[in-house]
Amino acid sequence: KKEYSEYVTKYASQYGVEENLIYALIKAESNFDPNAVSHQNAKGLMQLMQSTAQDLAKKSKIELNNENILDPDVNIQLGTQYIASLLNKYDCVEVALAAYNAGSGNVDKWISSGKIKADGSDIENIPYKETNTYVRKIMRDYEIYKQL
């Protein structure tokens, strides 16, 4: 399904991210539940951590609070802004997704220690099992969304 298309289309275009990647991310993160809150306290459709969301909101001049972080418009804007910054940093979809899930700090360590390649050619070597599965699931769903 491609829910919230008005926001996905708007922010995909604004931040230069492929719409289908955003749909695949939302599906993996919250299964399109705007009120989703994880055990780690990540929030909304794109499961943003409060601190990450706060930093992104400042850059976009958004006044963020506990309510509007769950607003699909705000959440998709910040989540898309975040994945765009990771795609820009790593220049590789798989590696950017790993960073979205496990954090840039971990991904930078994995690359510098040779655990994974910066070009994403060996994502099956991602040391965190959850992140490993996460990246492969999103890449699979991303391909499916491209066919729809």
Language-model features: where?
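Catalytic glycan-binding domains that act on GlcNAc-containing polysaccharides
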Residues: 1-148
